């Protein structure tokens, strides 16, 4: 499910670094209005809701997959269970100045970042 609640325009795509320690864009930026409701992309448990480097962040564990949403003023707390589509907070200004956008990230395990857009569309399987 789109964390904006509806299909959103991708302002900046996923751009993984060539090496884990190099710079890159480990998520996608989605066009969204400041103050708009941000929803959980899937069922899971909130593992973090608070500030990281002066930016509000919500992180949700989906059983080995973790999604992050920023800058989001949380309406949830660590330990809360959420379903896909449940509100988790409101989008704050500051990420895509002068416009507003939601940075949505996804990772498997400790450091394997994936394109969160891949969570929206099931894999296509060709039948033989």
Predicted ranges, named:
Residues 9-40:
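Short glycine/threonine/proline-enriched tight-turn/helix- or strand-capping micro-motif at secondary-structure
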Residues 9-11, 27-29, 57-59, 68, ...:
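Soluble periplasmic/extracytoplasmic beta-strand elements of cell-envelope proteins
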Residues 13, 49-50, 91-94:
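Residue-level recognition of beta-strand microenvironments
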Residues 15, 35, 51, 63-65, ...:
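Solvent-exposed coil/turn segments that connect beta secondary-structure elements
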Residues 37-46, 76-91:
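Short, well-structured beta-strand-loop connectors
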Residues 41-75, 100:
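Zn2+-dependent peptidoglycan hydrolase active-site motif and core
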Residues 58-61, 80-128:
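Conserved, short, structured surface segments that act as functional micro-motifs
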């Amino acid at each position: 499910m789109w964390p904006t609640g509806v299909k959103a325009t991708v302002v900046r795509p996923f751009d993984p670094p060539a090496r884990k320690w190099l710079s890159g864009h480990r998520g996608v930026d989605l066009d969204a209005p400041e103050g708009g409701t941000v929803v959980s992309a899937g069922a899971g448990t909130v593992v973090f809701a608070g500030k990281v480097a002066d930016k509000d962040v919500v992180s949700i564990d989906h059983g080995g997959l973790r999604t992050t949403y920023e800058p989001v003023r949380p309406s949830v707390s660590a330990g809360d269970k959420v379903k896909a589509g449940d509100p988790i907070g409101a989008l704050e200004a500051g990420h895509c100045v002068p416009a507003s956008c939601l940075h949505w990230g996804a990772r498997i395990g400790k450091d394997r970042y994936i394109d969160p857009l891949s969570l929206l569309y099931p894999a296509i399987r060709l039948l033989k």
